Amino acid sequence: MQPLTHEPIMTAMPTPTNADGIDASVTNEPTWFQTHFIGCMEMFADAKTAAEYFDAHQGWFIRCAHPMKAKPIGANGYALTIGKFGSFGYQVEPKIGLHLLPQDEGVYRIETIPVPNYTPPGYEVDFKAVQTLVEIPFEPSEELAADGSTLPSKMTRVEWQLDLKVGVCFPQFIKKLPEAVIQKTGDRILAQIVKLVSNRLTYKVQEDFHTSQGEATLKLFKKHWQQTKGRGVCEQVSPAL
């Protein structure tokens, strides 16, 4: 897997300053962008085993989030710094607080919480995610079945949904651009960020989980990933949850 870049997804122009005669003062009213995604992680174990892993997120979340920076907030929260993103000469380095609620009969929810001693500089984030553990019979492909390895009888699909909204207080010089241009660009960048983070985080969590289950299970996961190329991991949808 390639490391998560901390460079902007879009190449930004040099940041204007007042010395250039451009109004760089920030507006008070945020412009809101939103995106909605669904996806799935496949775990080659029963739901009980998968749930035990997710319940013990303190042991893997920070490690799997790397190279993003993650710091604990209490027992079930994390302050996550995503990286630098931007366009039109304006960049932000989002830091969000995420609360991983304890499971409720195989359902996990993640929501936004404040980051202690931190005020977001010109942006707001509303993050709502739901993960559901679904245990199903394992039906291997012909290639996996012919491998001769011992295969599990059950597997768990971790089906997730994300509703993400971000409000940004732009400088005045950006607000002079057509509203439709700002909206379209912002929505697109937000979707790119979600795809980038989700694809890499999903792989690392799956790899970490299957490593914990032994060499044979890790080998099975990697073969399956090569066959599927990560299909279904992350897909943008509409409307909102």
Give the predicted meaning of each segment.
Residues 177-230:
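A conserved amphipathic terminal alpha-helix motif
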Residues 120-187:
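Beta-strand/loop substructures that line and gate deep hydrophobic ligand-binding cavities in soluble
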Residues 2-21, 210-241:
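Charge-rich (especially acidic), low-complexity segments
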Residues 39-47, 84-88, 94, 100-106, ...:
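Beta-strand elements of well-folded, non-transmembrane domains
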Residues 57, 112-114:
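Acidic, aromatic-enriched beta-alpha/helix-loop junctions
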Residues 62-68, 98, 124-135, 157-166, ...:
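Domain-wide signal for the mature, well-folded portions of proteins, strongly enriched
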Residues 2-91, 97-99:
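Hydrophobic ligand-binding cavity/cleft-lining segments
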Residues 70-76, 101-105, 150-154:
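Short, ordered beta-strand-loop transition motifs
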